[in-house]
């Protein structure tokens, strides 16, 4: 739970309103970067950025009726982004005429909800709240994909229990070995364009590659959806990312997202939903498989969604899928999820952003200026051109063509072609001595396509080690994990320290062809497919759309907006004065002055505290001095699916991949303080519950990852953002160590919405206001989390 979040669990709250007043694929495979992000550009607070008004001036807004899916160019009242339009369709209980906007808290009933190996904990939550029947079994999809190589009796029993539950409730179920859940959601048509599709996994963003609004939920949310068909969501700030140019030969979607993560690496899109856009020509250079890769890794970029438009490229892809489905499953007819009739219906009125839709920020990237690129080691925010790493002769021990990010048939074909070219008509060459190259397809159908094309056989002949279609090493499970001292390169999505094995190993990320070329050579290398366009010397990125004329117009619109806002404020104040008597008006001014005086005296307004919720929370500060501490650092993946792990063990392993000394340094009752973007990464709820198991009641950070905030709320872990405290700790303790006991004291006065810091014995004491903690959040925490809250509500029904 984070103080600035105000979830409503099963009700709708409107957080704020806004006035819109603004105007052959592998032949393209490959990023030479010599640009740096703007110095000092650190957008740490997701909700503090001034909205950028797009496309229209205030005078162009007209009260014109329009379809909710009006095409760009259609002027409507209260224009919406694509994200807002989709949420509008799946929000329930809205007041009549309400149009949702970024910042609103809404109750959503998503089209689909997928769970995977975490389904059994969801089952236990589902039953513990008193639910006996899934609200809508057509809404739920269950897949087994994470720990499929674990043949222990306990894991096999868990898998069988999950299957039995799914069968009992008539839920669509996909067994271990069928593929990764996200890929199944795509290829089976569950993630349909224009729908809100969620999963209890952080890479649900991937559905945006087929123009579905995909976003992660956590286990407790999934249980709520199973039981009631709905859960809560706050519509995030929305960023527009415009692509210009076209991908050069040898550049991939993986290179695009690595570039975005590395070049915009100051949390520009942290906790945002991203809408990708560009000209028809530009977007046609991004096939659906590349879009899936890009959307998938918007998670690593810090976003909670990343959606592409519904366009002709998507239509062609859907047509091909529908034709294959009709050929292979003629008996299904209209019951199939991907049909030509459904496609026709979709494209009769596809959702698109309105003219004048409001975006929190706008960024652009010129695809023509990209070249092959590698992320790492152990970070997606650090990236280097392949050609520069080739000159360093970095030896590798392991290579991986795995994950929902890049192990589809097209990716497997790209890797196989590296070996075919090296064969030059002769025998397929072997992987370099001392290198282990692990391959597993994103799904069984994708593997079958690769087998029919001969690509799978090429990789096996080269000496690749086959694993089942599942998550495997990407999650740090199964065979082939990185050992201490290893260097690995992977086509997956995360290379965080300890993610794919030992924290003493180094992991890089790259496209499938770069991974294959590296495995063949025994060191990081590219396949040599990149053809640099004439005149390209650097990657072109920036704020805005990349269109100087349009961006200049937007700047003018922003200036006008500021003037109009000031005028509206003055008019509003005058109207209120006129509506009141002179005495009342004088009283209002007097009260305002009194309030200011009271604030100067430190006498803050009080909020109500519900029974069972503490008025104050205090303790000694233990400081983890790092930004972007991810969920793998907080709670390693190797423990995530050990459902029988004890609370004491959780307390011992918390922060293990970040700093093993944390367990001995931190004590029950401490206040954990960390840097910015704390808790980024996966949806595992143990990142929150393990901190609670350690006896730590409150986490303070410069900012939080959205999914960690959600898990905190649902599991009754308190949190508050105090960037000033992080800055002061770093100023005072110059020597950077992973974890330190500071001797400082922290107190959160919930009733007064104020925090007080005492900087050591005899040190300075200072205070500042923080966001109010509303009653509904207090209620959830007071009863021990959302699961118990829902159970209580069900028992009262």
Swiss-Prot record:
What the entry lists under Pfam families is as follows: Aconitase (PF00330), Aconitase_C (PF00694)
Q: How is the cofactor bound?
A: Binds 1 [4Fe-4S] cluster per subunit.
> Which positions bind [4Fe-4S] cluster?
404, 471, 474
Q: Name one GO biological process term.
A: lysine biosynthetic process via aminoadipic acid
Its subcellular locations are: Mitochondrion
Cofactor(s) required for function per UniProt = [4Fe-4S] cluster
Q: What class of enzyme is it?
A: lyase
Q: Which GO terms describe its cellular component?
A: mitochondrion
Pathway named in the protein's UniProt entry:
Amino-acid biosynthesis; L-lysine biosynthesis via AAA pathway; L-alpha-aminoadipate from 2-oxoglutarate: step 3/5
Give the reaction(s) catalysed. Answer: (2R,3S)-homoisocitrate = cis-homoaconitate + H2O
> Which SUPFAM superfamilies is this protein grouped with?
Aconitase iron-sulfur domain (SSF53732), LeuD/IlvD-like (SSF52016)
The residues forming the transit peptide are 1-47
Gene Ontology MF annotations: 4 iron, 4 sulfur cluster binding; homoaconitate hydratase activity; metal ion binding
Chief location: mitochondrion
State the UniProt keywords alphabetically. Amino-acid biosynthesis, Iron, Iron-sulfur, Lyase, Lysine biosynthesis, Metal-binding, Mitochondrion, Transit peptide
PANTHER family given for it? Answer: HOMOACONITASE, MITOCHONDRIAL (PTHR43822:SF2), HOMOACONITASE, MITOCHONDRIAL-RELATED (PTHR43822)
| Role noted for this protein | Catalyzes the reversible hydration of cis-homoaconitate to (2R,3S)-homoisocitrate, a step in the alpha-aminoadipate pathway for lysine biosynthesis.
User: Would you identify the family this protein belongs to, as annotated?
Assistant: Belongs to the aconitase/IPM isomerase family.
Q: Tell me the NCBIfam families matching this sequence.
A: h_aconitase
Name the record gives this protein = Homoaconitase, mitochondrial
């Amino acid at each position: 739970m984070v103080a600035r979040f105000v979830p409503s669990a099963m009700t709708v709250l409107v957080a704020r309103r806004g006035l819109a007043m603004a105007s052959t694929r592998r032949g393209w495979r490959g990023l030479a970067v010599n640009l740096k992000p703007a110095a000092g550009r650190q957008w740490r607070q997701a909700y503090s950025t001034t909205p950028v008004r797009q496309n229209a001036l205030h005078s162009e807004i007209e009260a014109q009726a329009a379809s909710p899916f009006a095409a760009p160019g259609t002027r409507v009242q209260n224009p919406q982004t694509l994200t807002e339009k989709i949420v509008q369709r799946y929000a329930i209980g809205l007041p009549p005429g309400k149009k949702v906007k970024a910042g609103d808290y809404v109750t959503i009933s998503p089209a689909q909800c997928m769970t995977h190996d975490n389904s059994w904990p969801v089952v236990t939550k589902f039953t513990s709240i008193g639910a006996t029947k899934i609200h809508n079994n057509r809404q739920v999809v269950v897949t087994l994909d994470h720990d499929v190589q674990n043949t222990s009796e306990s894991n096999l029993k868990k898998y069988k229990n999950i299957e039995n539950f799914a069968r009992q409730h008539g839920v669509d179920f996909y067994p271990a070995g069928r593929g990764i859940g996200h890929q199944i959601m795509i290829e089976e048509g569950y993630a349909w364009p224009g729908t809100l599709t969620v999963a209890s996994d952080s890479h649900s963003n991937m559905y945006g590659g087929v123009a579905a609004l995909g976003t992660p939920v956590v286990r407790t949310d999934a249980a709520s959806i199973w039981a009631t068909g709905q859960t809560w969501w706050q519509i995030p700030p929305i960023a527009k990312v415009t692509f210009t140019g076209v991908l050069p030969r040898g550049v991939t979607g993986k290179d695009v997202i690595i570039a975005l993560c590395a070049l915009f690496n100051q949390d520009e899109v942290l906790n945002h939903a991203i809408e990708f856009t560009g000209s028809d020509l530009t977007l046609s250079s991004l096939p659906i498989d590349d879009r899936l890769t890009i959307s998938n890794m918007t998670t690593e970029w810090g976003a909670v969604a990343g959606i592409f438009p519904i366009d002709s490229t998507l239509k062609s892809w859907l047509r091909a899928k529908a034709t294959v489905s009709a050929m292979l499953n003629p008996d299904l007819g209209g019951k199939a999820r991907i049909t030509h009739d459904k496609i026709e219906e979709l494209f009769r009125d596809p959702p698109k952003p309105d003219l004048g839709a409001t975006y929190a920020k706008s960024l652009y990237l010129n695809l023509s200026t990209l070249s092959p690129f590698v992320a790492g080691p152990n970070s997606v925010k650090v990236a280097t051109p392949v050609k520069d790493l080739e000159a360093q002769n970095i030896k590798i021990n392991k290579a991986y063509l795995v994950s929902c990010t890049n192990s589809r048939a097209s990716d497997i074909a790209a890797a196989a072609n590296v070996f075919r070219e090296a064969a030059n008509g002769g025998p397929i060459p072997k992987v370099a001595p001392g290198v282990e190259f692990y391959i597993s397809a994103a799904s069984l159908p994708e593997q079958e396509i690769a087998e029919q094309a001969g690509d799978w056989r090429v990789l096996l002949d080269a000496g690749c080690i086959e694993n089942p279609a599942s998550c495997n090493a990407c999650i740090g499970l199964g065979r082939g994990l990185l050992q201490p001292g290893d260097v690995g390169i992977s086509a997956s999505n995360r290379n965080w320290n300890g993610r794919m094995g030992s924290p003493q190993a180094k992991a890089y990320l790259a496209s499938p062809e770069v991974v294959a070329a590296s495995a063949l050579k025994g060191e990081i290398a590219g396949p040599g497919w990149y053809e640099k366009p004439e005149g390209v010397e650097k990657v072109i990125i920036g704020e805005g759309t990349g269109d100087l004329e349009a961006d200049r117009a937007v700047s003018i619109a922003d200036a006008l907006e500021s003037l109009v806002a000031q005028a509206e404020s003055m008019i509003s104040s005058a109207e209120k004065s006129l509506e009141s008597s002179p005495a009342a008006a004088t009283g209002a001014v007097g009260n305002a002055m009194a309030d200011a005086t009271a604030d100067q005296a430190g006498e803050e307004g009080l909020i109500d505290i519900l029974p069972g919720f503490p008025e104050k929370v205090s303790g000694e500060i233990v400081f983890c001095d790092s930004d972007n501490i991810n969920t793998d650092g907080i709670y390693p993946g190797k423990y995530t699916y050990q459902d029988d792990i004890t609370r004491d063990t959780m307390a011992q392993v918390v922060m293990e991949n970040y700093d093993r000394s944390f367990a001995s340094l931190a004590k029950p009752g401490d206040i954990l303080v960390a840097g910015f973007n704390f808790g980024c990464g996966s949806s595992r709820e143990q990142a929150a519950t393990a901190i609670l198991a350690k006896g730590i009641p409150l986490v303070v950070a410069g900012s939080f990852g959205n999914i960690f905030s959600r898990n905190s709320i649902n599991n009754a872990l308190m949190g508050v953002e105090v960037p000033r405290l992080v800055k002061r700790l770093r100023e005072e303790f110059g020597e950077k160590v992973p974890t330190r006991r500071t001797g400082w004291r922290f107190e959160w006065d919930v009733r007064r919405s104020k925090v007080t810091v005492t900087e050591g014995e005899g040190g300075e004491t200072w205070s500042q206001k923080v966001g109010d903690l509303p009653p509904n959040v207090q209620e959830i925490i007071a009863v021990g989390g959302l699961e118990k809250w829902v159970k209580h509500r069900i028992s009262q029904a």
